[in-house]
Amino acid sequence: MIQCKKEYLIEEKNINSLVTQAKKILNHRKMLYNRYIGKKRTEVDVPLEFYSTNIVSGYFGGKAPEYSIKQENNKKKIKIITDFFNKAIGKNTDAEEFQLLIDYIRDYNDDSSFFYNLVKDYFMTGACYGLTYETKDNEIVYTHISSLQCVAIYDYSAPLQKIGLLRVWQELDNDGFNCNMVEIITNDSKFYYKNSKLQPNEYKLDKDMSEKITWKLTPAFAVENVDNLAIFEPVISLIDSYQQIIENNRNIFQYNDDAKLMITGYRPSNEMFIQDPDNPENNIINPERIKEDEIYLKSKVFYTDDTTGKIEWIIKNINDTASENHKKTLMELILMTICVPNVTDVGFTNADNSSALEKKFFPLEQAIIQADKQFKKELLAMWENIVDRIN
């Protein structure tokens, strides 16, 4: 979230400052996205971010919200509202016709995909965005846009009012160089700015692309987590610890797989090092010793000259019980903190009725209450904007 006055937002000289603020937010979201897709720069990747995001997104966003139009017929209630707010309701309205219009707009916008993509972005990066616009055929379109490009802009009022949306992305200019494109959308304008290779911190208005628009509200859907957190962000350190245990065990297994053979009570026929024929001052590994070692390694039976001799592999022992208990504790802490059920545990697989399953998902329902309220508020604002546009 960025806060400023609308007058500040539309001044060309302020664009670099706004982009700088936005990039700090977007870089953090990029880090979260990289964790989700498994780019952690480690040899072993435990995709708990992927698991938790998909479970919560499917639970909350698997079914798009339903909209119903209510036509008020209670004359007493109509009179009270009309007198109190000086606003007529229920006049010249047809609920069925209006419902058909809403359903038609939802159908051609693929409302279920739009909603799910928003939800997934929200839980993955802590924010989600969409744009609303009218086509040349006078169709109202709302579409999802990546949270890796956008930041909502609010004023200083209480409650906060959304006054714009800033979107930034990279594209090639006419000379083949990367430049930053900036789009700022308000309820009455779309401004486009871009920088150049020679002046990366100076953004110039593109008058040809910029245009005036007419909307009651900013035609942008924006839900940002009030704590700026993705669903898995509070447990990143625990996930890293869990991953470290698995990586440590993997390294030990690899070490044991490549273990050295220790032989006592026997002396090989050939020395390990001999003088380099080409450079007498240096020693080299004796090739005959290598051959001798290979013969003994491949041999099924080996005899030592000394009765006290023995043969054994130099390996590291793993305390498997302690390792598994530590992993189990970490997994329980991770899933408990983010309120995501473990669908592989015995309690979940043995839940043979809907009541038992509901108990498993009860913590998750509590965790998404805030998101539910935020989405409902923003969806109602989006439809208020669309209805006002139609009227």
Spans of features found by a protein language model:
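Generic structural signal for hydrophobic core residues of well-folded globular domains
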Residues: 59, 72, 84-88, 92, ...
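A general structural signal for short secondary-structure junctions and capping/turn motifs
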Residues: 119-124, 155-157, 173-174, 250-254, ...
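Extended, regular secondary-structure scaffolds
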Residues: 129-231
